[in-house]
Amino acid sequence: MNSTIETTVRSVLSEQGKLSEDAQSIAVDADLYRAGMTSHASVNVMLGLEDEFDIEFPEERLTKATFTSIQSIAEAVEAIQND
């Protein structure tokens, strides 16, 4: 996983994720929904990531699985950037 992407994902999660845990210290594979993120917050996270990375999540990536963990989000961002 790209460390720059991970850092930015954590920053967006801190601002938009409404997590009950600190986004900077949560494990990359921790379930963000169990950490307090709601479906509404995940939409805000997606919008924040689109702004930060100047990307657009394609429809097939708009799934709960994409936003379940820092790792899954970072992998999706990296894949979108490489498309």
Placement of each model-derived feature along the sequence:
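Thiotemplate assembly-line natural product biosynthesis machinery
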Residues: 1-22, 75-83
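Phosphopantetheinylated carrier protein domains
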Residues: 42-66
